[in-house]
Amino acid sequence: MATKIRLKRMGAKKAPFYRLVVADSRSPRDGRVVEEIGYYNPVKQPVEIKVDEEKALHWLTTGAQPSETVRALLKKAGVWQKYIAAREAK
């Protein structure tokens, strides 16, 4: 199963927030997910990003591919740098 870390859109019309989820790459954007690892609220000021580092690092090390947007959010949250450091330490 090819897994991706991507955003799942939630919320009302014109007031979106997103959950960072691990899903099969063939499932629809808002379809079934394997696990939720955080959320992103672009409407709130300042922008709110929460990521469960342990879960995110687990899925990244097992081969889950993040979307471009999720990769940018992981960089802002500081998780991506930890993943790169752990990968280079091996």
Curated annotation (Swiss-Prot):
Family recorded in the similarity comment: Belongs to the bacterial ribosomal protein bS16 family.
GO molecular function, one term: structural constituent of ribosome
SUPFAM superfamilies: Ribosomal protein S16
Gene3D superfamilies: 3.30.1320.10
Keywords of this entry: Ribonucleoprotein, Ribosomal protein
InterPro entries per record: Ribosomal_bS16 (IPR000307), Ribosomal_bS16_CS (IPR020592), Ribosomal_bS16_dom_sf (IPR023803)
PROSITE patterns linked: RIBOSOMAL_S16
Keyword Transmembrane applies: no
One Gene Ontology term, aspect cellular component: cytoplasm
Any Gene Ontology biological process: translation
NCBIfam families attached to this UniProt entry: S16
Protein name: Small ribosomal subunit protein bS16
